[in-house]
Amino acid sequence: MERFIFAALLVVALSLSGTGADPQCLPGWSSSDGYCYKVFKEYKRWDDAEMFCRQEVEGGHLVSIHSKTEAKFLARLVFRKFILLNVWIGLSSPGKHGIWRWSDGSSFYYTSWAFGEPNNFLWNEYCVGLMSITGHRKWSDQNCRSKRYFICKAQPQGEGSTW
């Protein structure tokens, strides 16, 4: 009997490892390094996607990316959703002067621009998406009015939350 219980617990532990399962994240959200993430397969313009993330969960925003590890996690998360299109992230140039800012207000120090980016093609690209052609690992500035899938990021709400 003890062997059976041990085996059952081992199977559960192994099935949850690497999935990002976290009791403090909403169902359907994935956890990594203290944050909750979710890919939304809904077409929205950049500003509408940001507003959606803010309304979806307290403290939510389009995803900010601060390390290669986080970028790899997000690429895998998007890949699991079988998305073959570019995906919005929370980086934009609100003043349209090439000064990039994360929508959550966090510091902008890590970059992963694709070759030749940002290029402000046709002087109309002030929002940033993960490029599908790079396996969602590299960034491209894009027209903010384009409708794309997107990734939201939030901190876990903690014990006793309404999540």
Swiss-Prot record:
- Supply the InterPro entries for this chain: C-type_lectin-like, C-type_lectin-like/link_sf, C-type_lectin/snaclec_domain, C-type_lectin_CS, CTDL_fold
* Signal peptide range in chain numbering: 1-21
Q: What is its main location?
A: secreted
Tissue-specificity statement: Expressed by the venom gland.
Q: Where does it sit, as one GO cellular component term?
A: extracellular region
Instruction: Recite the UniProt keywords alphabetically.
Output: Calcium, Disulfide bond, Lectin, Metal-binding, Secreted, Signal
Q: Which GO terms describe its molecular function?
A: carbohydrate binding; metal ion binding
Keyword Metal-binding included in the entry's annotation? yes
Annotated motif Mannose-binding: location in the chain? 117-119
Q: Which residues bind Ca(2+)?
A: 125, 141
Could you tell me what this protein does?
A: Mannose-binding lectin which recognizes specific carbohydrate structures and agglutinates a variety of animal cells by binding to cell-surface glycoproteins and glycolipids. May be a calcium-dependent lectin.
What's this protein's family per the entry? Belongs to the true venom lectin family.
Listed name of the protein: C-type lectin lectoxin-Lio1
Give the source lineage, highest ranks first.
Answer: Eukaryota, Metazoa, Chordata, Craniata, Vertebrata
